[in-house]
Amino acid sequence: LALLIAVQFVTRSMGQYVTGSLVNLILIASGLMCGLWGGLAVAVLSPICAFSIGIGPAFPQVVPAVALGNAVLVLLWVLIADAKNAPIARQAIALVVAAVAKFLTLYLVIVKWLVPMVLTLNEKQTAVLSASFSFPQLITAAIGGVLAMLLVPPLRRAIKD
């Protein structure tokens, strides 16, 4: 959790694609290396912590939606590809399924429900929030998944040794 918050803080000026990809990498790695409950704890607590220190979502109503999207990502990765030596095909399936599911979760909850029905936003805020929680979420979840596929196996070996 601390690593995730530190990465968000350090990379916040680098844009959504860098920060989001690294956040998703850490979320996936947490689930695969610490187990489902450890990964879910990081997934749910990270947007709360990020919001509380001013580096997360700008609106408190968005925090639970981000936590839900993170939890979906971790849950699907762990369910599909948690085996210590999961074949690359299972990892690829996890990458696609989890990235699409996180994207759809955030898009439907934030863009299609919170923005038009719950939040009171001006036109510019609506455009920014809608853009942030649409297609870029799919890309950053996929990049985070690729990075996890590359980094989790050597991390597991390093910890085992």
Residues covered by each model-derived region:
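Loop-helix junctions at membrane interfaces
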Residues: 1-161
